[in-house]
A protein has these predicted regions:
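Bacterial Sec-dependent N-terminal signal peptides
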Residues: 1-28
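Membrane-proximal, proline-rich intrinsically disordered regions
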Residues: 19-63
Length: 195
């Protein structure tokens, strides 16, 4: 009986101390270093690709919306039908655009987290430069897609000076300022050169 009590006490003590890190709860938005191995960089990049295939991005809206807006095909879906008719302020079209904006910048924020950690670990892992380059190219790509939808057409007069979208380069939940078309394009090209 005495050995059962000792055995149970040892098991309980091991379980209570072994879960310490697992049970830690971090406030939402707190930056956590989840990149302790090269595989974790790959997992984070796979996570971003998975985000990009969501229905608000390349899984649906980001593919269909430009086609409908350019009237390459018609649809009976009320959100897309309104956009095809040039109605940009109705509730259906506005919610679609908000969903794209939110999910795109959420993906960009996750990409920025990878970029910041990859820059710190540039000489730590065999493929650190590859992870950094891939993340920078993804950041440029997603910003370019957002610019295409929410920025002025490039052929419009003074389009290069018009305020368009924020170009977010830091992992943060703060609101970033809107930049001109030229500044966004310059940032895209800079990220692509670095990649």
């Amino acid at each position: 009986m005495k050995s059962k009590i000792i055995f149970t006490t040892i098991i309980a003590a091991a379980l209570a101390t072994g879960c310490d890190k697992f049970l830690d709860v971090h406030p939402k938005g707190e930056k956590i270093n989840m990149f302790e191995t090269a595989e974790e960089y790959e997992d984070a990049l796979y996570g971003v690709y998975s985000e990009l295939t969501g229905s608000n991005l390349y899984g649906q809206h980001l593919i269909i919306l430009p086609e409908v807006m350019s009237q390459n095909f018609t649809t009976s879906d009320y959100k897309y039908a309104e956009l095809a008719e040039g109605e940009m302020t109705s509730s259906g079209s506005t919610s679609t655009k908000k969903e794209i904006w939110k999910d795109a910048y959420e993906a960009i924020n996750h990409i920025n987290n990878i970029v910041e950690h990859a820059e710190d670990d540039i000489d730590t892992y065999k493929h650190s430069r590859l992870y950094l380059g891939e993340a920078l190219a993804l950041r440029a790509f997603v910003h370019y897609e957002v610019l295409k939808l929410f920025g002025p057409p490039y052929w419009a007069s003074d389009s290069e000076k018009k305020t368009t979208i924020p170009y977010v380069t830091k992992y943060s939940f703060d609101i970033s300022p809107l930049l001109s078309y030229d500044e966004v394009c310059r940032n895209i090209l800079e990220d692509l050169k670095r990649a």
